[in-house]
Amino acid sequence: MDKRIPVGADTLRIRNLGLQDYDTVWQAMRDFTVRRDSATVDELWWVEHPPVFTLGLNGQECHLRDVGDIPVVRCDRGGQVTYHGPGQSIVYILVDLRRRALGVRQLVDALELSVVDLLQSYEIETERRANAPGVYVQGRKIASLGLRVRKGCCYHGLSLNVAMDLSPFYRIDPCGYSGMEVIDLKRLGMELPLADVQQNLSRYLVRRLGYSAPFYGEENRMIK
């Protein structure tokens, strides 16, 4: 199905792209955003990445303490340094903010609250911090976000730690904070298939972002 389908602003395509190199998806997000116009349907891209550290626009190399053989990519999202790896569920948010009448702060709230909704459904208590975007459990970060807005449209997105090797986080200062601890769902006693987490979080994202007509696009197919 072509991305320029004649539908309303409440339509959202959801794709599962599987395991993909970070650079490949980053370039695809930029290309999608450059090419999109008023007829382009908004999309969510679910993805996993092989191990990689990413430095955002505000990223300082002093927060890369011992990267070892894990590659480092300097990218154009907001924020500092983070880690992506297998067992982490990442959703990229490709949304026309002007069309949805959303400000960046409203978008950040919607993304964080979607994770809060999900974790509350698992009976996990959460917190948010005004000075450190993301979602925290027992004082440890479980979800991070970083966005870029270009001509009123956003890309990049949100990552949720599901069942992963957390040790690379301790080779950096996560999000620029020395000593910040992280956690995942598995360590909270929730051993869930990644696909189930993605499906459930998609439902909360759709609700918080105000879409009424979500549908699933091509599985495991990179955008051209």
From Swiss-Prot:
Residues carrying the site annotation Lowers pKa of active site Cys: K141
SUPFAM superfamilies according to UniProt: Class II aaRS and biotin synthetases
Gene Ontology terms describing biological process: protein modification process
Domain BPL/LPL catalytic residues, every copy: 38-213
Entry annotated with the keyword Magnesium: no
Subcellular location: Cytoplasm
Residue numbers binding substrate: R77, G78, G79, Q80, V81, T82, Y83, H84, S144, L145, G146, G157, L158, S159
Keywords: Acyltransferase, Cytoplasm, Transferase
InterPro entries reported for this sequence: aa-tRNA-synth_II/BPL/LPL (IPR045864), BPL_LPL_catalytic (IPR004143), Octanoyltransferase (IPR000544), Octanoyltransferase_CS (IPR020605)
Pathway: Protein modification; protein lipoylation via endogenous pathway; protein N(6)-(lipoyl)lysine from octanoyl-[acyl-carrier-protein]: step 1/2
Stretch forming the signal peptide: none
The keyword Transit peptide belongs to this UniProt entry's keyword annotation: no
Enzyme Commission numbers on file: 2.3.1.181
Active site positions: C175 (acyl-thioester intermediate)
The protein's enzyme class: transferase
Catalytic reaction list: octanoyl-[ACP] + L-lysyl-[protein] = N(6)-octanoyl-L-lysyl-[protein] + holo-[ACP] + H(+)
Function: Catalyzes the transfer of endogenously produced octanoic acid from octanoyl-acyl-carrier-protein onto the lipoyl domains of lipoate-dependent enzymes. Lipoyl-ACP can also act as a substrate although octanoyl-ACP is likely to be the physiological substrate.
PANTHER family per record: LIPOYLTRANSFERASE 2, MITOCHONDRIAL-RELATED, OCTANOYLTRANSFERASE
Miscellaneous information on this protein: In the reaction, the free carboxyl group of octanoic acid is attached via an amide linkage to the epsilon-amino group of a specific lysine residue of lipoyl domains of lipoate-dependent enzymes.
Protein family per UniProt: Belongs to the LipB family.
Protein name: Octanoyltransferase
Species of provenance: Nitrosococcus oceani (strain ATCC 19707 / BCRC 17464 / JCM 30415 / NCIMB 11848 / C-107)
